[in-house]
Amino acid sequence: MNLRPLHDRVIVKRQEEEKVSAGGIVLPGSAAEKPSQGEVIAVGEGKLLENGERRKMAVKAGDKILFGKYTGSEVKVDGVDYIIMREDEIFAVIE
């Protein structure tokens, strides 16, 4: 199944969770922090402005991004976890 985000929404695949702490302690899945990095999988057409024009998206598929730990809505499609968020919830693109 393919997902196509609408308007200024972005579909992101979260980076894998860290299983070992900085001190070398193995963390169970429930104790590991949600990573705030991911890869953009798909982007919408852009935000519709009041004058009827669309603002071009600043990110594209394949970009690595930083975002808040509790940003967006989590969905599971074909056994894969994704986050759907608005473009303005993205903090930065990792270059």
Curated annotation (Swiss-Prot):
Identify the InterPro entries for this entry. Chaperonin_GroES, Chaperonin_GroES_sf, Chaprnonin_Cpn10_CS, GroES-like_sf
Q: Is-annotated flag, keyword Chaperone?
A: yes
**What Gene Ontology molecular function terms does this protein carry?**
ATP binding; metal ion binding; protein folding chaperone; protein-folding chaperone binding; unfolded protein binding
Tell me where on the tree of life, at the top rank, the source sits: Bacteria
Q: Where in the cell is it found?
A: Cytoplasm
Q: Which PANTHER family match?
A: 10 KDA HEAT SHOCK PROTEIN (PTHR10772), CO-CHAPERONIN GROES (PTHR10772:SF58)
- Protein's recorded name: Co-chaperonin GroES
- GO cellular component terms listed in the entry, alphabetical order: cytoplasm
Give the similarity note: Belongs to the GroES chaperonin family.
Lineage of origin:
Bacteria, Pseudomonadati, Pseudomonadota, Gammaproteobacteria, Cardiobacteriales
The protein's role, per its UniProt record: Together with the chaperonin GroEL, plays an essential role in assisting protein folding. The GroEL-GroES system forms a nano-cage that allows encapsulation of the non-native substrate proteins and provides a physical environment optimized to promote and accelerate protein folding. GroES binds to the apical surface of the GroEL ring, thereby capping the opening of the GroEL channel.
Query: Keyword Ion transport on this protein?
Result: no
Gene3D superfamilies named among the record's database cross-references? GroES chaperonin
Q: Which UniProt keywords apply?
A: Chaperone, Cytoplasm
Q: Which organism is it from?
A: Dichelobacter nodosus (strain VCS1703A)
Q: How does it assemble?
A: Heptamer of 7 subunits arranged in a ring. Interacts with the chaperonin GroEL.
One biological-process term from Gene Ontology? chaperone cofactor-dependent protein refolding
